[in-house]
Structure formats: structure tokens, C-alpha cells
Amino acid sequence: MKTLLLTLVVVTIVCLDLGDGLICYVDSKTSRTCPPGENVCFTETWCDARCSLLGKRVDLGCAATCPTAKPGVDITCCSTDKCNPFPTQKHR
């Protein structure tokens, strides 16, 4: 009986460990499991010289902490699987 209980505890711990990786989008169609220690998905958008023609530039990915916003850069962060989809661009 003790062996069965110990086996169940070990299996539970192993199963919980395997499901820890956060899944974030890294481009408009691709997502990946973040490496250990990176528990935040981010979306970073900004305008460059081609913004009026092509829309805002977009970076997606995983991070350990939410990146610090810089002037002219919008950043959103979240911590659930696939919570950072590629933003829809407004056509001009």
C-alpha cells in the first residue's frame, strides 16, 4: 500500500512538472513553449519610417519580465498560453 501511494505521488509530481511551460506567439502564425524562467508573453508595437505604408512593426515573444516601454513603443504583457496574438492592423 505504501508503494502504491509513493508511486502516485511521484507520478503526480512528474506530470505537474511537465506542464509548466508557457506558450507564446513569436510571429503572426507561430507559437512556442517558453524556456524555463520566461513566464510572460509580450506584444511590442511601434512605428518606423514605413508605418504609413505597412502599419506598425510588431515583435512577439517570451520574457522573464515585461519589457520596459520606451517612447513611441507600446508593450502589452500577459501570462496565459497564446495570450499575445498578432494584432490586427488597421488599413489606411
UniProtKB/Swiss-Prot annotation:
Disulfide bonds join 24-41, 34-62, 47-51, 66-77, 78-83. InterPro entries: Snake_3FTx, Snake_toxin-like_sf, Snake_toxin_con_site, Toxin_cobra-type. Residues 1-21 form the signal peptide. One of its GO terms (molecular function) is ion channel regulator activity. It is found in: Secreted. Belongs to the three-finger toxin family. Long-chain subfamily. Type II alpha-neurotoxin sub-subfamily. Its main location: secreted. It holds the Pfam family Toxin_cobra-type. This is Alpha-elapitoxin-As2a. It comes from the Eukaryota. It comes from Austrelaps superbus. Keywords: Acetylcholine receptor inhibiting toxin, Disulfide bond, Ion channel impairing toxin, Neurotoxin, Postsynaptic neurotoxin, Secreted, Signal, Toxin. GO terms for cellular component: extracellular region. Binds with high affinity to muscular (alpha-1/CHRNA1) and neuronal (alpha-7/CHRNA7) nicotinic acetylcholine receptor (nAChR) and inhibits acetylcholine from binding to the receptor, thereby impairing neuromuscular and neuronal transmission. Expressed by the venom gland.
